[in-house]
């Protein structure tokens, strides 16, 4: 299947100054509801990483999970979650986060191995605060981050520069 940049972009909606002033919300729900677009997104990531040395995908909940699950399946690698809240009584690493809707991110202490080469997966990169916090969690577990990927990156919000300041490559499927 050929990647149709126009189709993908037509299914992404940007809401500026929502949920608060100075913040943009990117709605990807139409991508998930279009089988053709969903397949293009998944195939785009799988083709990009099929020959990469990826041992595990670590995805940030919630909106990244359906996409990351399909990419992990396509690459035949395990999928781990970074959560916004502790869900079980197990031991978790915690990193404080300056996000709007939650104060910290968590990953189970036994989720990643020190030998893992991780693809960190988020749905949208805006300011870079979430990928900064998530990358600190992955590194705390001892794993190495191969790259960060996202479906959409907004260049005017600082996230691309934030990834560079963390000395991490960022692969956005779509940039605005």
Question: What does each model-found stretch correspond to?
Answer:
Residues 1-53, 111:
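Active-site-facing substrate-recognition patch
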Residues 54-63:
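Short glycine-rich phosphate-binding loop at a beta-alpha junction
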Residues 123, 128:
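Conserved G/P- and acidic residue-centered "switch" motifs that form tight phosphate/ATP-binding loops
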Residues 59, 120-121:
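Generic enzyme active-site microenvironment
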Residues 55, 116, 146:
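Conserved acidic residues
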Residues 77-119:
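Short, glycine/charge-rich flexible loops or terminal/linker lids adjacent to PRPP-binding catalytic cores
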Residues 66-76, 135:
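Short Gly/Thr/Asp-enriched flexible loops that form oxyanion-binding sites at enzyme active sites
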Residues 2-5, 10-11, 133-176:
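PRPP-dependent phosphoribosyltransferase catalytic core
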């Amino acid at each position: 299947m050929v990647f149709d940049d126009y189709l993908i972009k037509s299914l992404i909606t940007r809401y500026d100054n929502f949920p608060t002033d100075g913040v943009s919300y990117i709605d990807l729900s139409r991508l998930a509801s279009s089988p053709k677009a969903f397949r293009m997104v998944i195939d785009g990531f799988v083709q990009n990483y099929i020959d990469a040395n990826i041992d595990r995908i670590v995805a940030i909940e919630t909106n990244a999970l359906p996409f990351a699950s399909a990419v992990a399946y396509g690459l035949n690698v395990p999928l781990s979650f970074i959560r916004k809240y502790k869900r079980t009584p197990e031991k978790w690493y915690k990193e404080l986060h300056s996000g709007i809707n939650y104060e910290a991110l968590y990953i189970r202490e036994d989720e990643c191995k020190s030998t893992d080469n991780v693809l960190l997966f988020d749905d949208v990169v805006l300011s870079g605060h979430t990928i900064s916090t998530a990358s600190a969690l992955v590194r705390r577990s001892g794993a190495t981050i191969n790259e960060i990927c996202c479906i959409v990156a907004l260049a005017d919000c600082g996230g691309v520069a934030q990834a560079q300041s963390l000395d991490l490559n960022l692969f956005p499927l779509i940039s605005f």
